[in-house]
Amino acid sequence: MGMNRVLVSQAAGGLAEYLKGYDKEPSIVIGYDGRKNSDVFARDTAEIMAGAGVKAYLLPRKLPTPVLAYAIQYFDTTAGVMVTASHNPPEDNGYKVYLGKANGGGQIVSPADKDIAALIDKVAAGNIQDLPRSDNYVVLNDEVVDAYITKTASLAKEPACDINYVYTAMHGVGYEVLSKTLAKAGLPQPHVVADQVWPDGTFPTVNFPNPEEKGALDLAIKVAKEKNAEFIIANDPDADRLAVAVPDAQGNWKSLHGNVVGCFLGWYLAKQYQGKQGTLACSLVSSPALAEIAKKYSFQSEETLTGFKYIGKVSGLLFGFEEALGYLVDPDKVRDKDGISAAIVFLDLVRNLKKQGKTLADYADEFTKEFGAYVSGQISIRVSDLSEIGKLMTALRNNPPAEIAGVKVAQFIDHIKTDRQSDILVFNLENGGRLIARPSGTEPKIKFYLDARGKDPKDADRVLAEFDEGVRHILRQDAYGKQDC
């Protein structure tokens, strides 16, 4: 069953009951993106919250998820809800819940998620017509949007004028806020992909509005070639993620891996924060290179479970990222990934490089000299029967390979048995490589994350290719039974 007003009403009713038990004077701020019925679902939520006695604020129009995340702290509300399905297909929609005050404005985690779910089930067992509604909620003006823009613009250290780049909003809500932030920061406006710059919940020009998907940046690349652009930046439809694409020496465009962008941003910010105390964090499946950056600049480093609901809760956080194009560059402002802020810091990095007469390619070379050549890959095995996921994870758990591609496994970690208590398997290799296996949280498949190191980028690519084939060879064995991988 897709998202509908009945489900939204049940969710809002259950969340309202939770908030009333959580805070003596509960309050909530509600946002929505440009997907079909997002505005309807947001108003339903506001009415039910107000009817339940929860003070409700509704953002003034379609806006990015990071603006909602910021509004929770700006108004010091008990909670926040964003109606969005991020980069999912057009027919999807979703309900993203945050807790403010003592929880810092991050996404809900256990046990709050389970407690809220139980209350939603209780509401669903009754008649939603019995839920009181009220129009006694506040429709906000642009004050909080302007405050977000001002705070985000301050991330740029200096103005710049000579950056030639392309931007696509992927039919989402990012462009208006990004454009105003660029103007405030004194950074140049991009060439835009006109067919994708304004919200359209049907996403007519892409198969999936996900900048990671093959072909999603085709129109942006076309504009970049016409404008002889240096690079492309893209937000996903709710603008909480950032993608970057660059041309190679032959003029062929390629997207930078999220680990590459994450380490570029992490290194840039680490140098700015030098002398401070704090933590650089990433999800467990993201690049181990961030820990090397933290070590060089005497910061703590931390690996969390997958998702910004965990990264955002890291104590003393200075910067966080996950390989799926999510970056948290300003933890004092929001405790969730923020594609607008990440774009500003990325552009400031480019500005800083230009000031030194350098390019992104030079920056990549310097990173390799400083920390080594890191590369990442992924193998996904889709299943038709969900039970196959458990069977494969059990086989790997009970019969872990002793070596992969001729390299010994130095350490095997089963996180079901650690304090993480999560279905994640980690294989650390003697040559510094790493394989992580985990079931997807959103799709019927198992994901294998591969990280490799080499003397230089070419050598690292060779090691990764051998690593990839080695993993596939193991999975084809009878013990694991994935002949088609």
Swiss-Prot record:
InterPro entries: A-D-PHexomutase_a/b/a-I (IPR005844), A-D-PHexomutase_a/b/a-I/II/III (IPR016055), A-D-PHexomutase_a/b/a-II (IPR005845), A-D-PHexomutase_a/b/a-III (IPR005846), A-D-PHexomutase_C (IPR005843), A-D-PHexomutase_C_sf (IPR036900), A-D-PHexomutase_CS (IPR016066), Alpha-D-phosphohexomutase_SF (IPR005841). GO terms for molecular function: magnesium ion binding; phosphomannomutase activity; phosphopentomutase activity. Coiled coil: none annotated. Pfam families: PGM_PMM_I, PGM_PMM_II, PGM_PMM_III, PGM_PMM_IV. This is Probable phosphomannomutase. It is an enzyme of class 5 (isomerase). It comes from Haemophilus influenzae (strain ATCC 51907 / DSM 11121 / KW20 / Rd). Mg(2+) binds at residues 86, 236, 238, 240. Binds 1 Mg(2+) ion per subunit. The keyword DNA-binding does not apply. PANTHER family: PHOSPHOGLUCOMUTASE 2B-RELATED, PHOSPHOMANNOMUTASE 45A. Keywords: Isomerase, Magnesium, Metal-binding, Phosphoprotein.
